[in-house]
Amino acid sequence: MAAKIRKGDKVIVLSGRDKGRTGEVFEVRPDADVALVRGINMIKRHQKQTQTQEGGIISKEAPIHLSNIAIVGKDGKPTRVGFKVLADGKKVRIAKSSGAEIDG
């Protein structure tokens, strides 16, 4: 299946404790249907000290399910993603709400 949400996309959270917040996707894990969004779904982890890294409590992003995020359209609202094949045979993502190309 084609990736509707990709690395670098600006997304908005649809549900959960961070509902309504926006951020940039910096990692997508298609096998688990989750993504990591910068500054969203932050958790605290107790880090054991190593030779290169000092120990303590660190904050990091936890994965968020793809069904709980949506791409932000040009108007700043969440939009669904569709696909369109151009005349030259190239497949591009489009915003369902406006019909505008997302990438390409």
Swiss-Prot record:
PROSITE patterns: RIBOSOMAL_L24. InterPro entries: KOW, Rib_uL2_dom2, Ribosomal_uL24, Ribosomal_uL24_CS, Ribosomal_uL24_KOW, Translation_prot_SH3-like_sf. GO terms for molecular function: rRNA binding; structural constituent of ribosome. Keywords: Ribonucleoprotein, Ribosomal protein, RNA-binding, rRNA-binding. One of its GO terms (cellular component) is ribosome. One of its GO terms (biological process) is translation. Part of the 50S ribosomal subunit. One of two assembly initiator proteins, it binds directly to the 5'-end of the 23S rRNA, where it nucleates assembly of the 50S subunit. One of the proteins that surrounds the polypeptide exit tunnel on the outside of the subunit. Belongs to the universal ribosomal protein uL24 family. PANTHER family: MITOCHONDRIAL RIBOSOMAL PROTEIN L24 (PTHR12903). NCBIfam families: rplX_bact. This is Large ribosomal subunit protein uL24. It comes from Rhodopseudomonas palustris (strain BisB5). The gene is rplX.
